[in-house]
């Protein structure tokens, strides 16, 4: 729907979620056809002929060297947990590797056939071959590579965060905190993720920043939820970032500039106007057992202070013993 008065709604998982289709489409009506006259032979319709794949030009030596070096960036893009040394590739093997990397960066590594049925957001089909052939012919491989990743600040932020956490992991990670940890120990732990933490800053302010970053209530206290969150291992943090980068690859390449966006994991709703956040508020989202749908739909109307009764399906699954 393209009416300008409609606001787009997106529910996006940033840690884990499932989804349901946003709009149910009515089944297509197949027109009835009369039977052919007796004795008439009906020929089957001709099969569609698939066009041949776009041929890929041979790589120059400079392009060959650049491509082999670029393929080492898989860890930086969240495609692998650790860098793996590989022998240089050449010829068709290298071209195939470029095609595979192009698909992975544009639409993710999960085959659409493996998507859960209830996930509504699916990546659009993408064939990297035509654009790769053009980039080779025009000697613009770096520009082609830059065009593959999602054009969102959220993805760029995750990429930068991934580099930060990989450095923390490579220097030994962080120790677990206890409930009775001293202020200096807690401050040192927070400083690993937040370089603005100083020895003279009140611990309350540093804790509040960390709590906001993790979608927690910014009490400034080292409560049970905050302690549990800070004690998540750096490897688990890296895995979560990589999963979120993959989900960004499933998103459409253009989001409506006027939209309501929900961070399911943090339970925060943000209103965007002109592609800029103008307000945010807490939202009610599900749990790992009863997950919030991942969807994209249109908001047609808003009911203020609506009467609401617990649906029987929710009552049976979540309330009744």
Regions found by a protein language model. Give the residues of each.
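Bacterial N-terminal signal peptides that target proteins for export
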Residues: 1-10
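Cationic-aromatic interfacial patches
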Residues: 26-137
């Amino acid at each position: 729907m393209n009416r300008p008065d409609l606001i787009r709604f997106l529910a996006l998982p940033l840690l884990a979620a499932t989804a349901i289709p946003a709009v149910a489409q009515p089944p297509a009506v197949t027109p009835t056809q009369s039977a052919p006259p007796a004795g008439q032979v009906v020929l089957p319709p001709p099969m569609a002929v698939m066009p041949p794949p776009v041929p890929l030009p041979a790589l120059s030596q400079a392009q060959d060297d650049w491509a082999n070096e670029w393929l080492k960036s898989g860890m930086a893009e969240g495609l692998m947990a650790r860098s793996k040394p590989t022998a240089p590739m050449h010829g068709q093997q290298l071209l195939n590797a470029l095609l595979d990397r192009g698909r992975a960066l544009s639409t993710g590594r999960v085959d659409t056939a493996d998507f859960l049925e209830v996930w509504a957001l699916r990546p659009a089909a993408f064939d990297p071959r035509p654009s790769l052939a053009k980039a080779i012919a025009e000697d613009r491989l770096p520009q082609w590579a830059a065009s593959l990743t999602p054009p969102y600040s959220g993805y760029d932020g995750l990429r930068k965060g991934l580099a930060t956490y990989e450095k923390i992991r490579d220097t030994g990670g962080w120790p677990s905190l206890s409930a009775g940890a001293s202020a200096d120990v807690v401050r040192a732990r927070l400083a690993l993720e937040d370089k603005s933490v100083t020895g003279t800053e009140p611990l309350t302010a540093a804790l509040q920043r960390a709590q906001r970053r993790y979608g927690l209530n910014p009490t400034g206290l080292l409560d049970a939820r905050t302690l549990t969150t800070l004690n998540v291992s750096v490897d688990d943090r890296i895995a979560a970032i990589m999963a979120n980068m993959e989900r960004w690859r499933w998103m459409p390449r253009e989001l409506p500039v006027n939209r309501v966006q929900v961070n399911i994991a943090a339970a925060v709703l943000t209103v965007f106007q002109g592609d800029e956040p103008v307000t945010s508020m807490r939202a009610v989202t599900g749990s790992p057992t009863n997950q919030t749908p991942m969807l994209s739909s249109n908001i047609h109307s808003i009911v203020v202070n609506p009467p609401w009764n617990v649906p029987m399906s929710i009552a049976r699954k979540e309330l009744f013993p």
